């Protein structure tokens, strides 16, 4: 039987991730293509010390990504300070991600186990 606290925590985390993705839209606008949760939260085998792994796919050049990445990291830090939930974001160009998807095991795992938030 699943404890109520586990269910309550799952929905709390879901809401925090959704809010994070909405704030990413504010930063990136239409250049944001996907927000994917992967790792233990996507698989459902997380524990109280797990971070939330998030792949952020964008239609931006590497230089454009460098210009906004500190904003994204600051946003993740602010969420951790407010909620105690540690979000670990990675920002990648969507075309590069798609290009390397069949070659890099890391990208394959994200594709296979990831949960698209937006």
Set out the residue ranges of the language-model regions.
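Catalytic core of pol beta-like nucleotidyltransferases
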Residues: 1-31, 43-48, 59-118
